[in-house]
């Protein structure tokens, strides 16, 4: 995101005319800012652009999930010939997530951890937040968050609900939306935070909280419970879940997980706002990464319960 987003010079006469379709501008600009994908973004950067990007943020998570599903299905036939350890697959998936977003959210988490761990007054904390160097707090927090994700994904890989891995990036980004709700403000008038923080409406989050579990229910109905890594002879046999596994319950658990991640993001954002005198883009990244870690753990609980 750094270097990709910032306010464009104001031109009151044609600023609105330079905006494209809200839907497509939001989606494509979100992919342009939040990933390494060569997707064209908006031509004008203002809070309208920022709002559209934040409204589309979970869609970016679904793109991550789509690529994750492709990775899983590509590894499936290989596992029919040679053993592919679930832990190795988990490492590859989490590494792919980080590479796809240029370690952006992990960097935000590290910066926020250093600043928060300093217990400094807001002015000094903001200086630490802007420091490009990473300290012990940042390194340790980033490492632990990645390890949690790897361990949780490894549990899911060999489970009957392996497809839930694809929802982890989505749930983390819904949590990230909470950081930019209208009751929050950016501590700087410039930069990415000023573009997006305070632009998100609650009903946007509520809509994603309905759509995501519905898609999880659909996946539970249509995708085989057999893991592509453990089903050697028929790695991709489609079929219904056993009667003991209720797809509606799985969709409900995804909804509960999303709500928990959002509640965490709301509480954590309040804490960060008090510590820094406002929020910035790093705070959004930290909430996304930690929200994804929390979601991964909660989904892994389901996987372990079904082993």
Swiss-Prot record:
This is Adenosylcobinamide-GDP ribazoletransferase. The chain crosses the membrane at residues 22-42, 58-78, 80-100, 137-157, 161-181, 212-232, 248-268, 283-303. It is found in: Cell membrane. Pfam families: CobS. GO terms for molecular function: adenosylcobinamide-GDP ribazoletransferase activity; cobalamin 5'-phosphate synthase activity. One of its GO terms (biological process) is cobalamin biosynthetic process. Belongs to the CobS family. Its EC number is 2.7.8.26. Keywords: Cell membrane, Cobalamin biosynthesis, Magnesium, Membrane, Transferase, Transmembrane, Transmembrane helix. Its cofactor is Mg(2+). The keyword Magnesium applies. Joins adenosylcobinamide-GDP and alpha-ribazole to generate adenosylcobalamin (Ado-cobalamin). Also synthesizes adenosylcobalamin 5'-phosphate from adenosylcobinamide-GDP and alpha-ribazole 5'-phosphate. PANTHER family: ADENOSYLCOBINAMIDE-GDP RIBAZOLETRANSFERASE (PTHR34148:SF1). One of its GO terms (cellular component) is plasma membrane. It catalyses: alpha-ribazole + adenosylcob(III)inamide-GDP = adenosylcob(III)alamin + GMP + H(+); alpha-ribazole 5'-phosphate + adenosylcob(III)inamide-GDP = adenosylcob(III)alamin 5'-phosphate + GMP + H(+).
């Amino acid at each position: 995101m750094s270097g990709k987003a910032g306010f464009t010079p104001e031109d009151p006469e044609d600023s609105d005319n330079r905006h494209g379709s809200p839907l497509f501008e939001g989606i494509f600009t979100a992919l342009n800012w939040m990933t390494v994908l060569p997707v064209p973004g908006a031509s004008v950067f203002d809070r309208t652009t920022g709002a559209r990007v934040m409204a589309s943020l979970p869609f970016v998570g679904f793109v991550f999930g789509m690529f994750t599903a492709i990775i899983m299905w590509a590894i499936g036939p290989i596992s029919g010939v040679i053993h592919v350890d679930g832990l190795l697959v988990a490492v590859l998936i989490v590494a792919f997530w980080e590479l796809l977003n240029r370690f952006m959210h992990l960097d935000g988490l590290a910066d926020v951890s250093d600043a928060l761990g300093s217990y400094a007054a807001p002015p000094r904390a903001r200086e630490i937040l802007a420091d490009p160097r990473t300290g012990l707090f940042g390194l340790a927090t980033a490492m632990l968050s990645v390890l949690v994700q790897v361990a949780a994904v490894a549990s899911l890989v060999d489970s009957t609900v392996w497809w839930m891995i694809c929802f982890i990036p989505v749930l983390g980004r819904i949590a990230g939306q909470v950081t930019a709700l209208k009751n929050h403000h950016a501590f700087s008038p410039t930069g990415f935070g000023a573009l997006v923080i305070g632009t998100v409406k609650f009903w946007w989050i509520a809509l994603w909280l309905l759509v995501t579990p519905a898609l999880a229910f659909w996946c539970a109905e249509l995708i085989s419970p057999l893991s592509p890594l453990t089903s050697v002879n028929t790695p991709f046999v489609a079929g219904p879940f056993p009667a003991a596994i209720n797809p509606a319950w799985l969709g409900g658990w995804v909804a509960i997980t999303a709500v928990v991640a959002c509640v965490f993001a709301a509480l954590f954002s309040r804490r960060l706002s008090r510590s820094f005198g406002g929020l910035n883009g790093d705070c959004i990244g930290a909430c996304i990464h930690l929200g994804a870690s929390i979601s991964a753990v909660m989904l892994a609980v389901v996987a372990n319960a079904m082993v």
